[in-house]
Design a protein with these regions (language model features):
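A generic, well-ordered mixed alpha/beta core segment in the N-terminal half of proteins
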Residues: 73, 83-106
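Active-site mouth loops of central-metabolism enzymes
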Residues: 7-25, 69-81, 133-154
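Short, well-ordered coil/turn segments that N-cap beta-strands
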Residues: 3-7, 35-38, 65-69, 94-96, ...
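Glycine-rich, proline-tolerant flexible connector loops at the mouths of alpha/beta enzymes
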Residues: 35-57, 103-113
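Conserved anion-binding
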Residues: 97-155
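Alpha-helix-loop-beta-strand connector modules within alpha/beta enzyme cores
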Residues: 48-72, 115-137
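Conserved N-terminal beta1-alpha1 strand-loop-helix module at the mouth
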Residues: 1-41, 51
């Protein structure tokens, strides 16, 4: 029987660009000492510029701290053009792992039509940037917006 060593990972939220990220950068240096398997970097849904937040922070973690990084990409408020630009920006800094998400719907803000489901985003990434590793997520009990389990599995 093989003994498996547990792995440790973290998920970080880029701060509001107006506030700055000095505290987060210090916390990341402390996390580095714990040798995490990876750190995932979230992205806000339509609130901040992904390049200034998610891409910049993922770049710092992967290239300055040498910790493998996964960038979140919530698609519901992104156009195909914006996703293609973001993939290019991530490629330029060497971050090639994406957590593809639909993203939360924000009351009062109309979602774009390019990516209704995370599966639409995944198909787009596989076509536009096939060298990226794409990770998905799901709700074990079924997505709350899905009309049925079958529909949930299909999307």
């Amino acid at each position: 029987m093989t003994k498996q060593t547990p792995s440790l990972s973290f998920e970080v939220f880029p701060p509001n660009p107006e506030v700055g990220n000095a505290k987060l950068l210090r916390a990341l240096e402390n996390m580095q000492e714990l040798a995490p398997h990876f750190i995932s970097v979230t992205a806000s849904n339509n609130k901040y510029n992904i390049k200034e937040t998610t891409v910049a922070l993922a770049n710092h973690i992967q290239n300055e701290l040498s910790i493998p990084t996964i960038a979140h990409l919530p698609a519901i408020y992104l156009s195909k053009e914006k996703v293609a630009d973001t993939l290019h920006e991530l490629d330029q800094v060497g971050v090639h792992r994406i957590l593809a998400l639909r993203g939360d719907i924000i009351p009062g803000i109309e979602p774009l039509k390019d990516f209704r489901y995370a599966t639409d985003l995944i198909e787009f990434i596989k076509t536009e940037a096939p060298h990226f590793d794409v990770i998905g997520a799901c709700y074990p009990e079924g997505h709350p917006d899905s009309p049925s389990q079958i529909s949930d599995i299909q999307n």
